[in-house]
């Protein structure tokens, strides 16, 4: 048998050597996941012993993290808007800054029965969160990845909103060509891929483990904003709103794209660091 305290100490030392941020916290999160308990219960009884299988599993996960493999892929879940979402390496990991987008939809929604489209839904974190906070909304999430759609459907079932959230596996470019012109939306929302080709070499190492299809957006990083603007011009209801997440440095270019489609720019929302993170 092996004491939790000693295993954690060793893991923290190893994570520190690899410059992993918050090594103590991350080691505790990994151990809690292995033992299927929360961190509070873990910390109450650090002298508890675990078996060899649990020890091996813990050390395997710590070794993965030392290679910059994302923590949330290791534990298979990520909290977003206070909701726990199941994730896998097949989906983009939900980011805290995307909560600004969801909060803006909730704040601006005036119609209890709004029709909302989430483009590039991933694990469904945006669509499912909106459904939880706007009970009457009719939401469609679209993604090109079959595995993403499977996980999104699982998350909608876990949150009991699958009757109001429909997920479609399709290429957005094909979807926008074939959609009935009468099926317009009150909100079109998206956290689209926005990494430019020239920016890839500057990304944090752990981001390379995430699906490239969820990151890459052409050489200038603006491909999907152009497509979303074109789609919005045709499929937004009168007084409808398109709300998109921004990169830290692309707000002016994105705003120009929508203005060039004769769509009125309303505002941007800044994130915790003062970057313009959401455009309405």
Residue positions per predicted region:
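Conserved beta-strand segments of alpha/beta enzyme cores
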Residues: 84, 138, 164-166, 264-267
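Conserved Class I SAM-dependent methyltransferase catalytic core
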Residues: 219-280
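Conserved SAM/SAH cofactor-binding pocket of Class I
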Residues: 96-206
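Conserved AdoMet
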Residues: 33-108
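Short helix-capping segments at alpha-helix termini
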Residues: 20, 134-136, 157-162, 235, ...
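Active-site beta-alpha loop architecture of Rossmann-like, nucleotide-cofactor-dependent enzymes
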Residues: 72, 195-198, 249
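Mobile active-site "lid"/loop adjacent to the S-adenosyl-L-methionine
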Residues: 194-224
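A short N-terminal interaction module
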Residues: 1-58
